[in-house]
Amino acid sequence: MAKGIRDKVVILGAGCSKFGERWDAEPADLMAEAFEECLADAGIEKNQIQAAWQSTGIDAFSVGPGAMPLSIALRLPYIPVTRLENYCASGTEAFRAATYAVASGACDIALAMGFEKLKDTGYGGLPQRSRGVT
């Protein structure tokens, strides 16, 4: 008998875009690159995904509003896509939400994707007020 989440959820696959100063790559290109690698690693088709979570650390930088950038870039079928924003913990939040969705039985296959493209923004770190500086 299952005692916890670890008995109800598995990670089917993972993917990552290439690191580096990729000035020529749009955010959608990087998301699609990681997604294709993830699908290949998992051995599934994108139409098997039943829900998705997109995470980004800070809304103000290059990704776009809401969860539409993920849905459009990956050409996901008509599934619920939720956007999460929680600074450096954003990826963990997306992973946790997808894990709980599967563990609860709300879906069988869920996608969690974290994304940032800060090099194009000139962003140099956390805003001053989040570091306690006034």
Features from the language model and the residues they span:
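Conserved "HGTGT" condensation-loop signature of ketosynthase/thiolase-family condensing enzymes
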Residues: 1-82, 103-104, 112-134
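Active-site-proximal alpha-helical scaffold in enzymes
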Residues: 86-116
